[in-house]
Each structure stands twice: as structure tokens, then as C-alpha cells.
Regions:
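Bacterial N-terminal signal peptides
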Residues: 9-19
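Short beta-strand->loop
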Residues: 110-121, 176-179, 212-225
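A ligand-binding cleft/hinge motif common to bilobed small-molecule-binding domains
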Residues: 94-107, 165-168, 191-220, 224
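An extracytoplasmic/periplasmic, membrane-proximal ligand-sensing/linker region
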Residues: 32-41, 46-57, 232-299
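Short helices/loops that flank or line small-molecule/ion binding pockets
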Residues: 79-93, 106-107, 124, 141, ...
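Bilobed "Venus flytrap"/periplasmic-binding protein-like clamshell domains
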Residues: 35, 40-63, 75, 98, ...
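Small-molecule pocket liners
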Residues: 123-128, 226-232
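Bacterial N-terminal signal peptides that target proteins for export
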Residues: 1-10
């Protein structure tokens, strides 16, 4: 074979390869666009980059296991996600108890699922943390006269539950604190305490556990809080609700094959799901009512 013929043959093989690749890509793209797009959002527990890393694998799973293509649309803060749902910029969202009730006041949303915790129960907790080098703070009552960082005012585990816990368990009110401030993300609260900007902070249990070996200690833990609801707009197709439920309720964390998938997801929902209903969040209503009578407006 001459050199020219060899070059020609190689070029032909390369051309055929890229032609096949392009055709495959076109088919893949066609399959993708053939699915109806559903936009999914979640309360901003962490910085947006971390949120994307922890939530995109769930979108990929839902796209693969339902007749829909799920795309993640992140909000800048807790309040914005309510606007996303109201304006139909997202159809499905993972909310907190407070954001669910706030959304429910403004338009109709339906809770369909709630995540399980590591113990297999559909609850999580608020955790009060302090620096592990701080010898003055060892229990809840030690927070009197101290500075405390809270998460968003719309956060259940980072604002509502810790305030309720302080008021009912320790008799400590906001006026008894040296100062306090709300931050956008739970991991921001943890870092503010680590940096010494605040004596203590209130975060969701998964964040407390993540920072426990990085300089924070756990001071106290709240009563169980009903799991973060996955909600849908009331006008979505029943087929969409059924598809989401089927895909997520079929997972069992004790199944090794399922666990490989679920461990790519955020700690908040990697242990499985249970069905949710509005009355599951009556305890959140109770906390809001109690604090309201004490002059604390939530949100």
C-alpha cells in the first residue's frame, strides 16, 4: 500500500468514526429533547456549587428512571424558591417545613414525599454547635449572654426549631443573647462559629455532623423535625407525581445496588423516602404559633 493510499485510508476511518459519533450524539440529543423538561429546585442549605454537586446526581437518576428530563434550577435563597414555584419556573422542589407553609399561604403546593434519616425514620433535627475549644459553652443554658448564628429566617432547622428549643427548653429568649444574626447557608453558620465570629450556631444535623471533626462540638439537639418535603405545584400532571414517587420509593438503602446510587446524593435524602401529607407539618405550625405569641415573627 502506497503512503498516499495509507493516509487516505486513515482519513476515511477517522471521517467514518466522527460521522458515527455525530449520529450517535444526534440520537442521544433527540432522546433527551423528546422528554418533557421538569425543573427541580431545593432550599439553599449550602453554597450553590456544593448544592449542584449534591443535587445533580438526583436529577440524573430521575431523568433515567422516569419519562421526564429533570433539570436543576438553584435559587439564591429560601424566599426565591417560593417565587420559582409560584411563577412556574420550577414544578418540583425540596422545601423545609417553614418554606412549605409559606408557599402554601400564597398558592397551592402538594407535599408528595419526605426523606428518611439514617435510622430509617422520616425526621431530622436541629443541632446547636460551638467551638470544641470553648470551655464556657457545654449545654443549652450556657448560651445566655452569648452570640449565636442562625441560618435563614425561612429555615426550619436553622432558625425556627432552634428558637423554639431555646425558648421552651432553656427559657432563653432572643433578648437574652448578646447578639444574633441570620446567614444564608447552614455551612456559613458553621464557619462563622469556627472563625470565632459567634460563640454558637444552629444548623441542620447533617451539617453539624460534617463539621464535628473540624473544630465544632455538639451542645444540644432538638426534638425530631418532620422530613424536608418534596413538593409539586398543584397543577402538575398526576403522571408526573406518580413517576417521581415510583422512582424514589422503589429505592432501598440496604440494597447494595441502590446504595451505590444513593450515596452520590446529599445526606438529606440518601437514605430513602416516605410518602408525605400536609398534616405531617402541623408541628411546624405549632412552633410558629408559639413563637408568634412570644413576639418572634417567623419568617
Amino acid at each position: 500500500m502506497s503512503f498516499k493510499r495509507l493516509i487516505f485510508s486513515l482519513l476515511l476511518i477517522i471521517a467514518l468514526f466522527f460521522s458515527a459519533f455525530s449520529a450517535e450524539s444526534a440520537v442521544s440529543s433527540k432522546d433527551k429533547t423528546a422528554k418533557e423538561v421538569i425543573y427541580f429546585s431545593a432550599i439553599t442549605l449550602y453554597h450553590p456549587i456544593v448544592m449542584y454537586q449534591r443535587y445533580q446526581p438526583l436529577m440524573d437518576y430521575l431523568t433515567k428512571n422516569t419519562p421526564y428530563r429533570f433539570e436543576l434550577r438553584l435559587s439564591q435563597d429560601y424566599g426565591n424558591i417560593i417565587n420559582f414555584l409560584k411563577s412556574n419556573k420550577v414544578q418540583v422542589a425540596l422545601l423545609g417545613g417553614v418554606t412549605y407553609l409559606e408557599a402554601k399561604k400564597k398558592f397551592d403546593v402538594i407535599p408528595i414525599l419526605k426523606p428518611l434519616g439514617p435510622d430509617g425514620k422520616p425526621f431530622y433535627r436541629c443541632v446547636i454547635v460551638a467551638r470544641d475549644t470553648d470551655k464556657e459553652i457545654n449545654e443549652l443554658s450556657d448560651l445566655k449572654g452569648k452570640s449565636v448564628a442562625f441560618a435563614s429566617k425561612l429555615s426550619t432547622s436553622g432558625n425556627l426549631a432552634p428558637l423554639y428549643h431555646l425558648y421552651t427548653e432553656a427559657g432563653i429568649e432572643l433578648k437574652d443573647l448578646a447578639r444574633y444574626k441570620n446567614f444564608r447557608y447552614h455551612d456559613s453558620v458553621a464557619r462563622e462559629v469556627l472563625r470565632g465570629n459567634f460563640d454558637a450556631g444552629a444548623v441542620i444535623d447533617s451539617v453539624a455532623n460534617r463539621f464535628k471533626n473540624r473544630g465544632l462540638k455538639i451542645i444540644d439537639v432538638s426534638e425530631p423535625i418532620p422530613g424536608l418535603p418534596i413538593v409539586v405545584r398543584a397543577d402538575v400532571s398526576p403522571k408526573l407525581i406518580e413517576a417521581i414517587k415510583r422512582a424514589l420509593l422503589s429505592l432501598d438503602y440496604n440494597n447494595p445496588e441502590h446504595r451505590k446510587i444513593m450515596e452520590q446524593w446529599d445526606e438529606e435524602f440518601r437514605y430513602g423516602f416516605a410518602e408525605a401529607k400536609d398534616s405531617d407539618y402541623d408541628s411546624i405550625r405549632k412552633m410558629i404559633d408559639y413563637l408568634g405569641k412570644k413576639g418572634v415573627k417567623i419568617p
